[in-house]
């Protein structure tokens, strides 16, 4: 099959180079977007009288027929077509004859592929908006049922202060909200039309770029034709936003992996979201969070690939840009499937061990700050109180006891302001309850945030 550019050359491509050069194996994913783009372009050529009304109708009907054949598995793009764009053009010419050769008037594959990729990515971002919202709802529902469940809070992976489990889960809603907002911002820059920029300099053909932009649902057009065909910022921004979202999914995955270990025993996985071992019959493996954690590296790699691809590439379009699609496609699939898997895991795959969680906050010094705050509330300077409590912790460690094991006479030796009610303040439930500052882990604050999120997510 002759290439669209073959008349310039005397010899045919080396078969290996032909395959190496082709993108049809992966850019065929853009077939529906390419058809959508071409239909809008044909309508515009008809509107500006570049095509007659009969030619316009013939081309549009031909493109619609190709779409039907593709959806019915009667048309499968493949080699020797170089890419999806010329594959469709060849198919159109075979269906309607010479008129099909007029479709490419006033455009280049450079602006065409940029348009196709933006249309495809826009749909993916809109789908991610739905998926992330569902993920947030799953976390919120789990939080609602665990407002008064206590869990150790950690810094440096060392016990720090007790928390409401709901408060811990709500932290992820905040992260996912930032992810949603980032994708929305990326969408605003995806939704700009390069169509009509042609190869790099625009065209002398009478076209209406604003018409095609409106037909395809773009917010506006690129104002510089060189920038229009060479811009891949939107690809990098999408993968960057995805990388951050994956980092958040990886973070909760790591926590779940820890929580379900025998050493922590804070939770267990249900049979719906766990697998076993081919050798060890007792095993129940957290494959879902492990896979999400592992897949995060793929997205990071895709981001590095795209950043390297555009580094040092001169204006305008270069063949390097053919390498933008596979990282984009892989990232979109990875982030979407990971979000879906995490939503299922949170909804029906994890059960918290309330008894172990409750016991875990009873047997440590994570209430030490509250012991200091007790003195602060009695007008003792914080740093003085801090040092006093440090001495008490050391005293207890040397004797292998906890604060609750101390007698009032013992604790008074460290500071006279201590009284019997100090032990009430040190109860983990009361410790958490007392954190009433806005955004804190106190139950009233957590309930307030749960209500706020219910309104935000329309639950």
From Swiss-Prot:
One of its GO terms (cellular component) is cytosol. Coiled coil: none annotated. It catalyses: 2-(N(omega)-L-arginino)succinate = fumarate + L-arginine. It is found in: Cytoplasm. It holds the Pfam family ASL_C2. The keyword Nucleus does not apply. InterPro entries: Arg_succ_lyase_C, Argininosuccinate_lyase, Fumarase/histidase_N, Fumarate_lyase_CS, Fumarate_lyase_fam, Fumarate_lyase_N, L-Aspartase-like. GO terms for molecular function: argininosuccinate lyase activity. Pathway: Amino-acid biosynthesis; L-arginine biosynthesis; L-arginine from L-ornithine and carbamoyl phosphate: step 3/3. Keywords: Amino-acid biosynthesis, Arginine biosynthesis, Cytoplasm, Lyase. It is an enzyme of class 4 (lyase). NCBIfam families: argH. Belongs to the lyase 1 family. Argininosuccinate lyase subfamily. PANTHER family: ARGININOSUCCINATE LYASE. This is Argininosuccinate lyase. It comes from Prochlorococcus marinus (strain MIT 9312). The lineage of its organism: Bacteria, Bacillati, Cyanobacteriota, Cyanophyceae, Synechococcales.
